């Protein structure tokens, strides 16, 4: 579930985090929440995790248990059968369009930044759109895996531009290809 809230959140609102221990071959993940819904999911060694979690309190929440079940299904080699509750703050119309396309990329498949740009251009009645702009929006994604930004590759098939690190991207794509 996406809540489009482009207003700045109350800076005093409590934020929570917990760590998900991934299977061998992947970095562990940090989950973040406002106490009700998932607000972030990143690999622990990513810059986003370091920046986003500075003042988060460790806590066990229902949304974390729900997200753990989703991650267990994912790392178990299956397309998860549900989506954990989440909210994305600061979602512009363009970012929403990009996320909508990302959410439609099936488990085990990939798209290029150009494919996504073409889909959005078509939806908006434009001749073309910048693949670089799409890359910026994909890189902005605060909830990796659930919103599958790792399934996006460069036009020449290059595995580029993944905030969770290229090693994790390679491992995720190989995991989904099995």
Task: List each language-model region with its residue ranges.
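Low-complexity, small/basic-enriched stretches
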Residues: 1-83, 154-178
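Nucleic acid-binding interface residues in structured DNA/RNA-binding domains
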Residues: 15-26, 78-178
């Amino acid at each position: 579930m996406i809540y489009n809230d482009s207003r700045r959140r109350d800076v005093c609102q409590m934020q929570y985090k917990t760590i998900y221990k991934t299977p061998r071959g992947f970095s562990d993940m940090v989950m973040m929440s406002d106490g009700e819904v998932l607000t972030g999911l990143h690999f622990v060694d990513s810059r986003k995790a370091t920046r986003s979690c500075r003042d988060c309190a460790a806590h066990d929440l229902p949304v974390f248990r729900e997200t753990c079940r989703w991650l267990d299904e994912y790392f178990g080699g299956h397309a998860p059968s549900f989506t954990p509750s989440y909210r994305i703050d600061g979602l512009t119309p363009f970012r929403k369009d990009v996320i909508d396309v990302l959410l439609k990329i099936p488990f085990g498949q990939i798209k290029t930044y150009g494919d996504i740009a073409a889909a959005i251009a078509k939806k908006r009645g434009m001749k073309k759109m910048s693949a670089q702009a799409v890359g910026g929006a994909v890189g902005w994604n605060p909830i990796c895996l659930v919103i599958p930004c790792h399934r996006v590759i460069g036009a020449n098939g290059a595995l580029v531009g993944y905030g969770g690190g290229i090693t994790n991207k390679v491992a995720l794509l190989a995991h989904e290809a099995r």
